[in-house]
């Protein structure tokens, strides 16, 4: 029998819980013990190192700090970190007035506050065409010997070295260029490393300096060992070794789990700690960058980020150390963020960072709900227990007396957000035997225990089921254990949680860059996990190591490619469809076709990326052009950043629209605009490319010249794209198109995003 708490308004009550849920989580976020310290940590960035000797660099930092604090004792007590390997800077505990005074020192380029950042599989590689068997057919994976010789640096929450994903059976010697080490600390020693895990360090001073109560060994491992689990999953996704017969209580039983570059080496830099689900101090993350650059990593996977930016990211977070890594040939891969489908929520927007959006896989863990008339509804669940025979259902939105109504029943609960006031634990505690969540499509992360029937229905299906049940005086449902559905019938989508472009502070730079699978990835579980729910991870932080693994393969295949060339190869060969040819859509209530602000160039196509034909390259001059365009950098600051007195900001006539990124985005088109790009031929020496234009709706797009002819002496050519508003005479939303250069073998495609802005400060 269907029951309700309020017979005349139960459906409204189901939705009423939404407001309470948001207020509760916003007001209850911070826990005791994480109160900021009275002397905040500030980061002072000084640019490129002026000395090769790190000791001399550190001494110069102490002298700068002493110029404000006066005594050597106060200086040593204040210093948290000296960044002296990959770049020059330091972190120090100071009073705000002292920090402001030090900001005026002539060697200080930028002063940053020490923000707190958050931590943002089996089927993944089959889905992308890299089949998960050690003996499968020829591919990029095998041409690169599965990434052997590459070192992937991971800045995250640590690593559980005993996992089978980090077994070194069959590995060759550690690369000669490696200069890192495995430190000895709390329940971790150099013996925990091997030829797979070749480096492991940790950084906590920045976070502890900002907390009233320091993190201690009762709640965390004060070592590279992973207590949170996130770092272990990220590492295994990027470069995990082959693990046969991987299973999660029957889920994907018999699968082979591996990372993107299964024979690549891993170096873990633990800078994130198990506080409030995962907290990373910017000061600690910078130190991890500093040492990773020095140690000799080939790729950096950094699955961290803050909330949507209220300022340029070159003033906060990871952009500056990432620039130094990229300038030294190390690609930096980071997430777009998990703040959902709202516009301008993307993070890590600097053009030198490879920013990753998340998509779903062609896999669904599905459970059947059967009515007494045999009508069925399909929901998502990881429930592996026995079938629940026909039983009563109750719909509730106000669970104040849930203890009186749930016993022996299945609860149907409507929710429109990721935070739910009614949890499986509460239902179980009060005798309920199942829970059906009805919520908007896209909240696909599976967060329920596998031993309790906890099923997700989207709002449309849930409303249909609710309406159907309400018309019956007596209705029961049956719940079946999950079944895995794989293949073309499961549509691939951009995850609802994946943050969207454009960046509100640099809208002319398209972000995110690329998309990769990031939802419901099956990864290793560390023994400290309380249950099996953490085995299944989702988010852009899981999509990030997918791309990092692919980048490692490309570095082995093309050792001379710059980070910008690698990004270009990924973006220009990406797919606008899933591997089955269906257009990618957006996971969420609007069901729209995905566009460049959802996925950048599209879904990664790693086999095409190894032979892109043409590439859009960039170097430090392009990146300083970007910095200068934001009016943050003077000639003096640019010279300090690059370590070259001859490097200066470009002339005032140079437009940010001409930055050689593999995209064209014009956020404020008022008339005709010319945009230039330069492409480098990395394909057949003698080749001819012709343009194919898909103009955004209502805009005119013309390309000149009409052909690009490459030969031995001409492997780099420029072209101009002329854009005009066409039929548009009002402020528009963004419209999307593309430009493809084709030689009938390669199709080198960049996205075009255009918006008119005839009236300033006018909101549509």
Swiss-Prot record:
Its main location: secreted. Keywords: Autocatalytic cleavage, Glycoprotein, Hydrolase, Protease, Secreted, Serine protease, Signal, Zymogen. Residues 124-610 form the Peptidase S8 domain. GO terms for molecular function: serine-type endopeptidase activity. The keyword Cell wall biogenesis/degradation does not apply. The active site is at residues 156, 230, 541. Residues 41-116 form the Inhibitor I9 domain. Its EC number is 3.4.21.-. It comes from the Eukaryota. PANTHER family: PROPROTEIN CONVERTASE SUBTILISIN/KEXIN. This is Subtilisin-like protease SBT3.1. It comes from Arabidopsis thaliana (Mouse-ear cress). The gene is SBT3.1.
């Amino acid at each position: 029998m269907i029951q309700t708490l309020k017979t005349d308004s139960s459906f409204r009550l189901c939705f009423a819980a939404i407001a309470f849920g948001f207020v509760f989580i916003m007001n209850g976020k911070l826990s005791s013990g994480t109160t900021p310290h009275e002397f905040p940590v500030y980061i002072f960035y000084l640019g490129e190192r002026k000395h090769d000797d790190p000791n001399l660099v550190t001494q110069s930092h102490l002298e700068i700090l002493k110029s404000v604090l006066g005594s050597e004792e106060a200086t040593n007590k204040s210093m948290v970190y000296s960044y002296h390997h990959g770049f020059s800077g330091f972190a120090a505990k100071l009073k705000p007035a002292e920090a402001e005074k030090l900001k005026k020192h002539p060697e200080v380029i930028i002063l940053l506050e020490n923000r707190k950042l958050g931590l943002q599989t089996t089927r993944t590689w089959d889905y992308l065409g890299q089949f998960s068997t050690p003996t499968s057919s020829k591919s990029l994976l095998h041409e690169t010997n599965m990434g052997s010789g590459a070192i992937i640096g991971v800045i995250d929450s640590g690593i559980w070295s005993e996992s089978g994903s980090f077994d070194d059976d069959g590995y060759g010697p550690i690369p000669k260029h490696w200069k890192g080490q495995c430190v000895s600390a709390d329940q971790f020693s150099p013996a925990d490393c091997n030829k797979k895990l070749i480096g492991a360090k940790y950084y906590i001073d920045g976070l502890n300096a900002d907390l009233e109560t320091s993190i201690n060994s009762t709640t965390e491992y004060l070592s590279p060992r992973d207590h949170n689990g996130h770092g272990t999953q990220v590492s295994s996704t990027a470069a995990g070794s082959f693990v046969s017969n991987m299973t999660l209580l029957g889920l994907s039983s018999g699968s082979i789990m591996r990372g993107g570059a299964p024979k690549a080496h891993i170096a873990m830099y633990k800078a994130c700690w198990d506080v409030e689900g995962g907290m990373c101090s910017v000061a600690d993350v910078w130190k991890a960058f500093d040492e990773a650059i020095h140690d000799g990593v080939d790729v950096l996977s950094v699955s961290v980020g803050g909330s949507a930016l209220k300022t340029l990211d070159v003033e906060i977070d990871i952009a500056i150390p990432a620039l130094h890594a990229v300038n030294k040939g190390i690609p930096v891969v980071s997430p777009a963020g998990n703040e959902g489908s709202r516009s301008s929520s993307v993070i890590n927007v600097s053009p030198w960072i490879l920013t990753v959006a998340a998509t779903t896989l062609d896999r669904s863990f599905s459970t059947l709900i059967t009515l007494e008339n045999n009508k069925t509804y399909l929901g998502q669940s990881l429930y592996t227990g026995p079938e629940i025979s026909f039983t009563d259902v109750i719909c509730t939105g106000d669970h104040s007396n849930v203890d009186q109504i749930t016993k022996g029943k299945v609860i149907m609960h409507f929710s429109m957000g990721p935070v739910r006031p009614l949890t499986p634990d509460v239902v179980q505690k009060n005798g309920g035997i199942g829970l059906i969540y009805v919520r908007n499509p896209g909240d696909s992360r599976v967060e329920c225990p596998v031993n309790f029937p906890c099923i997700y229905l989207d709002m449309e299906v849930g409303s249909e089921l609710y309406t159907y049940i309400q018309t019956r005086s007596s209705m029961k449902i049956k719940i079946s254990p999950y079944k895995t559905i794989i293949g073309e019938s499961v549509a691939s989508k951009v995850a609802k949680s994946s943050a969207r472009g454009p960046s509100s502070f640099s809208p002319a730079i398209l972000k995110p860059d690329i998309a990769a699978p990031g939802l419901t990835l099956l990864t290793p579980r560390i023994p400290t996990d309380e249950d099996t729910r953490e085995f299944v991870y989702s988010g852009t932080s899981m999509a990030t190591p997918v791309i990092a693994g692919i980048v490692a393969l490309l570095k082995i295949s093309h050792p001379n490619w710059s980070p910008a060339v690698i990004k270009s190869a990924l973006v220009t060969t990406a797919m606008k469809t899933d591997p089955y040819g269906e257009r990618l859509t957006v996971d969420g209530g609007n069901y729209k076709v995905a566009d460049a602000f959802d996925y950048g160039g599209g879904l990664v196509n790693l086999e095409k990326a190894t032979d892109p034909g043409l590439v859009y390259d960039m170097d430090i001059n392009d990146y300083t052009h970007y910095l200068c365009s934001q009016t943050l950098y003077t000639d003096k600051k640019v010279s300090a950043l690059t370590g070259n007195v001859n490097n200066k900001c470009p002339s005032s006539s140079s437009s940010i629209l001409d930055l050689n990124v593999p995209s064209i985005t014009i956020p404020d088109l008022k008339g005709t605009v010319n945009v230039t790009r330069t492409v480098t031929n990395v394909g057949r020496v003698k080749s001819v490319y012709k343009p194919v234009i898909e103009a955004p709706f209502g805009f005119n797009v013309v390309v000149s010249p009409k052909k690009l002819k490459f030969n031995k002496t001409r492997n780099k050519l420029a072209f101009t794209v002329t854009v005009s508003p066409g039929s548009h005479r009002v402020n528009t939303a963004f419209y999307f198109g593309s430009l493809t250069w084709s030689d009938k073998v390669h199709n080198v495609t960049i996205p075009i995003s255009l918006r008119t802005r005839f009236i300033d400060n006018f909101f549509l």
